[in-house]
Amino acid sequence: MRVALGIEYDGSSFCGWQRQLEVDSVQAQIEKALSYVANEPITVSCAGRTDTGVHGTGQVVHFDTDVQRPMTAWTQGVNANLPDSVAIRWAKEVDDSFHARYSATARRYRYVIYNHKLRPGILSAGVSHYHGDIDETLMHKAAQLFVGEHDFTSFRALHCQSKTPFRNVHQVNVTRQGMYVMVDIQANAFLHHMVRNIVGSLLQIGLGNQPIEWITELFALKNRKLAAPTAKPNGLYLVDVTYPEHYQLPKLALGPLFMLD
């Protein structure tokens, strides 16, 4: 039997999603709790591996097991054995053809900026604080230059292991809700640090340090060192993963909880 799970987590206390020796990870906590409920070792595959400090409201995983359990065991039972910062949001038996990573057709991230002169005391690990005056309208205009298929060499980590720098961005929107500025981006897939590097460069435009046309120049230069510094991890959320409709996976509010959809 193959089971898919929807997962939400606060990544601030973990060294990323992927299981690692000697440090805590979201994957390790999920597999530990699942193995306890199943009474056998369980290994999961995920839709997207998030970095240290990055959060998820729409992460999807799958695992295989011959153990017979009601679906509530994979939600309520597993949640009872997880730390407060990790939660199973739904569980569904799926066809063996389903794969959390390879069946996905798109991923969606949201980056939340707290734009205020003073830093926040609450939610400080869930937002990125920038005190300068940000023009979200300029950021949104510049963001449209990312839409479509491009060579994102200037916007991926120098140590990115992907064989190709090309990705297809479906949409990017920059909006403001009071003191919060949100960058919402969806693509077929993402390169390492791609979202945070895009946000870092958009912030330079929103702060008035660069013109909108700078993005076009960066695409042409294909040089990561000439783009802006990588934005901080704590404002980034994996909020949704898209799959073919025939899998009929549950859909929840994108989140994070304190933001309006």
Curated annotation (Swiss-Prot):
The active site is at D51. Its EC number is 5.4.99.12. The keyword Coiled coil does not apply. Substrate binds at Y109. It catalyses: uridine(38/39/40) in tRNA = pseudouridine(38/39/40) in tRNA. It comes from the Bacteria. The keyword tRNA processing applies. Keywords: Isomerase, tRNA processing. One of its GO terms (molecular function) is RNA binding. Formation of pseudouridine at positions 38, 39 and 40 in the anticodon stem and loop of transfer RNAs. Homodimer. HAMAP family: TruA. This is tRNA pseudouridine synthase A. The gene is truA.
